[in-house]
């Protein structure tokens, strides 16, 4: 019989950095939870804990409402990394 594969347990990167609040204006922090089409990625792919996943989802939804992140992206014009064009706010 084939042996079961052992998967490495993912750790929440927000817990590692001891993030207590995820702000919707901090695009650099929430961009890791968005796909190339600006969809919210699930917990099983990002490795976020439930508390931080809820905070990320709320921040992304608020950023969409404030027009900082688009709701949808045209399928014909998908770019590999949408955040390459953004200049860092903080230096």
From Swiss-Prot:
Cystine pairs: none
Keywords attached to this entry: Ribonucleoprotein, Ribosomal protein, RNA-binding, rRNA-binding
InterPro entries: Ribosomal_bS18, Ribosomal_bS18_CS, Ribosomal_bS18_sf
Database matches in PROSITE patterns: RIBOSOMAL_S18 (PS00057)
Keyword Ribosomal protein appears in the UniProt entry: yes
One GO process term, biological-process aspect: translation
Gene Ontology MF terms in the entry: small ribosomal subunit rRNA binding; structural constituent of ribosome
Tree of life domain: Bacteria
Pfam family membership, one: Ribosomal_S18
Recorded GO CC terms: cytosolic small ribosomal subunit
Family: Belongs to the bacterial ribosomal protein bS18 family.
Binding partners and assembly: Part of the 30S ribosomal subunit. Forms a tight heterodimer with protein bS6.
Matching NCBIfam families: S18 (TIGR00165)
HAMAP family: Ribosomal_bS18
Functional description taken from the UniProt entry: Binds as a heterodimer with protein bS6 to the central domain of the 16S rRNA, where it helps stabilize the platform of the 30S subunit.
Full protein name: Small ribosomal subunit protein bS18
Organism, scientific name: Nitratiruptor sp. (strain SB155-2)
Species lineage: Bacteria, Pseudomonadati, Campylobacterota, Epsilonproteobacteria, Nautiliales
